Structure formats: structure tokens, C-alpha cells
Amino acid sequence: MKNIKLIVSDLDGTLLPYGQENLSENVKNRIRRIIECGVTFTVSSGRTYNELFGFLGEFSDRIYFTCCDGALTVKNGKVIYGRRIENGDIGMFFSKRSDDFSFVLHGAFENYSFGNIPSEAEKYNCIPVRNIFDVKEKIFKITSFGGKISLPDYCGIRTHWDGGDNSVSQYVNRYCNKSTALSDLQMRLMLAKYDTAVLGDRGNDVCMVKNAKYSYCIGNGCVELSDKCAFRFDCGELALDDIIGRL
């Protein structure tokens, strides 16, 4: 009987080394091997579903995608779990008046832009909007450019990435993280921490460790994660090899 039935892995810095633009065939072959062994594979990342699909689209009907730092999970092109950003919180972005400020609203499958977004945001293939009423789906992440929002204590969002006053910042639902999304998936699959392995490299992966018996820290970029994980490897490929050896 397999000890590991669910594998949840971060993408950037874990499966995808920093500075590398495409997922290596070696990593894809390991994911393919895991699936062939009958184990459920999930990629869990701060990226949007469309971004993750760009890396792992060939597996889209066989794996789960946990996106936007735990804000939603997608399987077979359908959202099975989600913690949206409420319209009242989105309104703070439309209310900010600055010629340099622009932002992108990320839905599960579409992206909406307000203001003159920089060229780096063109990859999102945004639908321009004039106000919140032009947005036709639930929003799970917001990316701002040329400034950031000062979040009041009572609001329902948190900063996922703080790029500073004049750079890129990202926001998600205050109550989402990778652990809550993983807990939901474990419940759906009727699995427990003893069936689960997680891989990560940064602080936002620390919360997943309590959900898994087998925890892997990739690299040395986060001391807290390294201290809490059961295993440490220099790269994601070696960690996947170790997991495959346990199947």
C-alpha cells in the first residue's frame, strides 16, 4: 500500500529554478511517473491559473492547480475551491487617484486591467475595464503597478507580494493560504497528513508543513522552512526522486 497518495509542490524555486523560463523535461518526466503510479499531484503557487497552465498544461486533466497563494484550486478547467476578493475591497483600487497607478484584476480564467498598465503586464492578455461593474467574474488576486494600497485593518485582503511604492505589489484574500487550500483538497480526496508530501522553498510554503508527514525544503532561502521540514534537497528534481522511491 502506498505511503504517499498526494504530492503538493510549489513552482518557482522548487520545480522551476529561479531565472529559468520553462519547466525542464526531467521535472515533467518525474511528474508523469508520479501520475502513472496513481498518486495525485498538485502544483501550489502564487501564480494565476493561466500562468500555471502555461507550464503544466499537458497535465491539466490529471493534476490539480492551487493558484494565487491558495486563493483557488482548479481541476479540469473548473474551480473546485475559492476565496475571492470582495467587491468592497476591490473598490479601494478603483478609488486610488494617481496617473502612475494601474492594476490587473485576476479572475480564475480572465484578467481585467484598469489604467495604463506597463508592458510587463501585457502577458496577462487583459480585458480593459472602466469600473468594477465591467468585471464579469470573481476576482482572486490583484496586481498593482506604480504604487500600492494602504490596507485598513478591517479590510478582507492581505499583501501577497510587496514590491515597494513604485514597483509591483500583489494582493489576495486575507483568509487564504496554501495550507487552507491543501486542507480543502485533502478533505475532498479523503486523505490525511500521513498520505501527503509537500515541497517548497519560501516562507509562504511553511504553512503547508503541518498538512504533511513528508515535507521537503528546496534550497536554503528560508531558514524557518528548512527547520520545520523533514527533508532538505538542493533542487526539486532530487526531492521528487526521493518521493518516487517511497511510492
Spans of model-derived segments:
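Active-site phosphate-binding/coordination module
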Residues: 22-119
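Short, structured coil segments at secondary-structure junctions
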Residues: 59-61, 69, 152-155, 211-212, ...
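Short active-site oxyanion
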Residues: 38-42, 61-63, 140-142, 194-196, ...
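Phosphate- and divalent-cation-binding pockets in alpha/beta enzyme and binding domains
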Residues: 51-54, 181, 207-208, 224, ...
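Asp-based, Mg2+/Mn2+-dependent phosphohydrolase catalytic module
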Residues: 187, 211, 215-247
